[in-house]
Every structure is written in structure tokens, then in C-alpha cells.
């Protein structure tokens, strides 16, 4: 399995630790940078990770910045990417099993290195569990990636709200 990993300058050492961990586990790593602590911008590396995954060069991706918010937003702009900002195992497993996430994002200043590697391993091992409901939801989310007139209409998500009101979704 190939895993793309990227970060900004704030968490380079965290990324290096993640890359080293993944390699010791036998995964092939595509290190998308950055490689030092010289100031840079997280969107560059979020985009690189997203493109590696979306193109099929990598199977999964990991993005890290200070809080995780910026780089996760950036990677989610790449068509075909479903990334979740996670800080715990439950969220990472849910993202993979229910939403077929292909990237996870971390805040290196928020989540410690040992916890990050545990979460990454849980994410890698989790398997997407397709259901009729989550397939439809994932398809609807994918429609947002491409501009179409319908997404500008106020009723774009009405079908899902109606299902919620009928009790078809459960928390």
C-alpha cells in the first residue's frame, strides 16, 4: 500500500516521525513535503497529497499542519478526495467505514505523535462498508465538487433532510 504524506513547516518533525513509522510497518510512502522548517504554506502540500491520492499514485493520504484545519480544507479541494480532520480513532474509523475517506488530516500541535500513528494505523486497517445510504450520500457530496446548476438551488440537500425528518437516519 502506498501512502502520501504532506505537511507545512510547523510540523515537519511530526511528518518525519509519521513517515518513519509507516516505513517500519512496510508501507510505501510518497513524501510530498515539506522537508524543513522554512516557512511555507499548507495548501501546497495538501494539494500534493490530494493529487497523489486522486491520481492513484497513492492509495491513501495523511496531511498535517499546526491545527489540521487549513491543510485538511486544502486537500478537500482536490476532486475525488474525501478527507476527514481527526483527533481520535473513532472518527478515523468512521470516516473510512462510512464515508470511504481516502485522506485523514491532523493538527500536529493538537494531536501527539504516538496517538497520530495509532490513528493512522486504525484508518489504514479500517475497510469501507458500503450501504445504499452511504453510497447515495457520497455521490451527493461528490456532486458538490463539480459545478452544476442544481447545487445552487435551495433544495440541493432536500432529499436528505426529508429522510432525516422521516427518521431514516440515526445518530
From Swiss-Prot:
Listed InterPro entries: LacB, RpiB_LacA_LacB, RpiB_LacA_LacB_sf
Gene Ontology biological process terms, A to Z: D-allose catabolic process; galactose catabolic process; lactose catabolic process via tagatose-6-phosphate; pentose-phosphate shunt, non-oxidative branch
Keyword Isomerase found: yes
GO molecular function: galactose-6-phosphate isomerase activity; ribose-5-phosphate isomerase activity
Pathway(s) served: Carbohydrate metabolism; D-galactose 6-phosphate degradation; D-tagatose 6-phosphate from D-galactose 6-phosphate: step 1/1
Enzyme nomenclature, EC number: 5.3.1.26
Pfam families: LacAB_rpiB (PF02502)
Superkingdom to which the source organism belongs: Bacteria
Subunit structure: Heteromultimeric protein consisting of LacA and LacB.
Family: Belongs to the LacAB/RpiB family.
NCBIfam families: lacB (TIGR01119), PRK05571.1 (NF004051), PRK08622.1 (NF006381), PRK12615.1 (NF009258), rpiB_lacA_lacB (TIGR00689)
Protein name: Galactose-6-phosphate isomerase subunit LacB
Organism: Streptococcus agalactiae serotype V (strain ATCC BAA-611 / 2603 V/R)
UniProt lineage: Bacteria, Bacillati, Bacillota, Bacilli, Lactobacillales
Amino acid at each position: 500500500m502506498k501512502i502520501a504524506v504532506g505537511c507545512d513547516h510547523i510540523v515537519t518533525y511530526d511528518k518525519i516521525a509519521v513517515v518513519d513509522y509507516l516505513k517500519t510497518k512496510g508501507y510505501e510512502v510518497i513524501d510530498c513535503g515539506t522537508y524543513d522548517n522554512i516557512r511555507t504554506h499548507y495548501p501546497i502540500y495538501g494539494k500534493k497529497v490530494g493529487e497523489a491520492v486522486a491520481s492513484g499514485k497513492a492509495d491513501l493520504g495523511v496531511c498535517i499542519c499546526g491545527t489540521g484545519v487549513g491543510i485538511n480544507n486544502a486537500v478537500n479541494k482536490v476532486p475525488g478526495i474525501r478527507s476527514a480532520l481527526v483527533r481520535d480513532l473513532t472518527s478515523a474509523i468512521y470516516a473510512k467505514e462510512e464515508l470511504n475517506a481516502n485522506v485523514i488530516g491532523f493538527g500536529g500541535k493538537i494531536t501527539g505523535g504516538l496517538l497520530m500513528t495509532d490513528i493512522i494505523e486504525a484508518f489504514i486497517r479500517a475497510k469501507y462498508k458500503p450501504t445504499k445510504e452511504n453510497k447515495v450520500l457520497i455521490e451527493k457530496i461528490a456532486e458538490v465538487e463539480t459545478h452544476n446548476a442544481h447545487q445552487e438551488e435551495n433544495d440541493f440537500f432536500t432529499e436528505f433532510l426529508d429522510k432525516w425528518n422521516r427518521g431514516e437516519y440515526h445518530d
